[in-house]
């Protein structure tokens, strides 16, 4: 016997007791369960209650409503907005959080940590007051570290962080197990010095500009061309000096040294000028401080090569290469056994192997959380070769645009790069190959040492 205010109790479902009206089909269940039945969601939605219970009271209706709502998952609450940090206090790049006491980007955080943990001692080649921002931060390590201290980064935080990590059990193999051997470390240091002493960084230069044809493109601005060709000649001499300082380079035959220099000279020229790119002004700066915008670079002689070079410069920016990486990549471009007409390609390959290993280890130690950075940087050699091939063609077309003769060093070093024979008329009207007028020993009065520099 039931009353009008009583509902039919049901067994627990998934561990919960609840109340529902009687099932619409009570005769389908054995009488031994006392008229109780499991609720049918389908029945609840499409049939009114029938025999077994009277109309439920308002209190039981409230209970039913609550129980039904429990079976329907509530929509997820919206995620809180991502936390926005102030820009990096050191370089003004996008911050990834508070590191060692200040808001900092991943690059400056890692730089400060490595500098403190390894007790690095840096030197500034200017007045110890270099501008540090996200473009120039890799150009002077001394001033970057000083700025880290100035904005409040704490040495003690680095030491505490290191001790904490030592106590934590390692869940996976560390990515910082790459260690330089003494030989590779010495090789890396020699190449870094060779690069820095033959190519001053942007922060060491006193920039100056010119208004010559700055607003519109012309076929060739002869004033800019004269200045550019003068600077290009000096740059080539510096590249030869850089090559002579590479361990093992002067142990190669003179013919192979000349072959490698001619094949890679334009690669290194482009790589070097692109590291002096300033994206905010879209300009490039030469070694005497002359700063040209994109239009002026076109008019100075780059012509159709201009946009390719500026695109490559933009692609280098996210790699954040420092002087050591640029020097090693330049050395790998130069000492390459797949160049045409080498007398001893196997010996050249053997010299390149430690350069590749040094670059790989240096990149992995500098960027332990970016294991794919080494192949990314190495693949830039392919881009450089593609631009250089077009650059060699541009040198040939320039000969028809300039009123005088091509500066001999530019013609000898660039026009005779791989796949492009120099065009010098002979007495019978045919073209003949230049005899090499430039060699590593003829750039200055010193002779080429034939003793290997590697141990």
UniProtKB/Swiss-Prot annotation:
What's one GO-annotated cellular component?
A: transcription regulator complex
Q: Where in the cell is it found?
A: Nucleus
**Tissue-wise expression:** Both isoforms expressed in heart, lung, kidney, liver, brain, lung and testis. Isoform Beta-1 is highly expressed in testes and brain. Levels increase during testes maturation. Isoform beta-2 is predominant in heart, kidney and lung.
Q: Could you tell me which CDD domains the record lists for this protein?
A: NR_DBD_RAR (cd06964), NR_LBD_RAR (cd06937)
Q: Where is the composition biased (Polar residues)?
A: 47-66, 424-434
Q: Which residues belong to any copy of the NR LBD domain?
A: 183-417
Give the chief site where it resides: nucleus
User: What Pfam families would the database entry show?
Assistant: Hormone_recep (PF00104), zf-C4 (PF00105)
Domain of life from the UniProt record: Eukaryota
GO terms classed as biological process? cellular response to corticotropin-releasing hormone stimulus; retinoic acid receptor signaling pathway
- Region Disordered, as annotated, extends over 45-78, 416-455
Residue ranges of the annotated DNA-binding region, renumbered to this chain: 88-153
Record's protein name: Retinoic acid receptor beta
- SMART domains, alphabetized: HOLI, ZnF_C4
This protein's encoding gene: RARB
Question: Any notes on this protein's domains?
Answer: Composed of three domains: a modulating N-terminal domain, a DNA-binding domain and a C-terminal ligand-binding domain.
Q: Where is this region: Modulating?
A: 1-87
Where do the ZnF regions (NR C4-type) fall? 88-108, 124-148
Q: Name the job this protein performs.
A: Receptor for retinoic acid. Retinoic acid receptors bind as heterodimers to their target response elements in response to their ligands, all-trans or 9-cis retinoic acid, and regulate gene expression in various biological processes. The RAR/RXR heterodimers bind to the retinoic acid response elements (RARE) composed of tandem 5'-AGGTCA-3' sites known as DR1-DR5. May be required for Sertoli cell differentiation and spermatogenesis.
Read off the InterPro entries from this record. Answer: NHR-like_dom_sf (IPR035500), NR_DBD_RAR (IPR047159), NR_LBD_RAR (IPR047158), Nucl_hrmn_rcpt_lig-bd (IPR000536), Nuclear_hrmn_rcpt (IPR001723), Retinoic_acid_rcpt (IPR003078), Znf_hrmn_rcpt (IPR001628), Znf_NHR/GATA (IPR013088)
Q: Which Gene3D superfamilies does the record match to this protein? A: Erythroid Transcription Factor GATA-1, subunit A, Retinoid X Receptor
Composition-biased stretches (Low complexity): 435-455
Q: How does it assemble?
A: Heterodimer; with a RXR molecule. Binds DNA preferentially as a RAR/RXR heterodimer.
Q: Tell me the keywords, alphabetical order.
A: DNA-binding, Metal-binding, Nucleus, Receptor, Transcription, Transcription regulation, Zinc, Zinc-finger
Keyword Chloroplast part of the UniProt annotation: no
Per the record, which residues fall in region Hinge? 154-182
What family does this chain come from, according to its entry? Belongs to the nuclear hormone receptor family. NR1 subfamily.
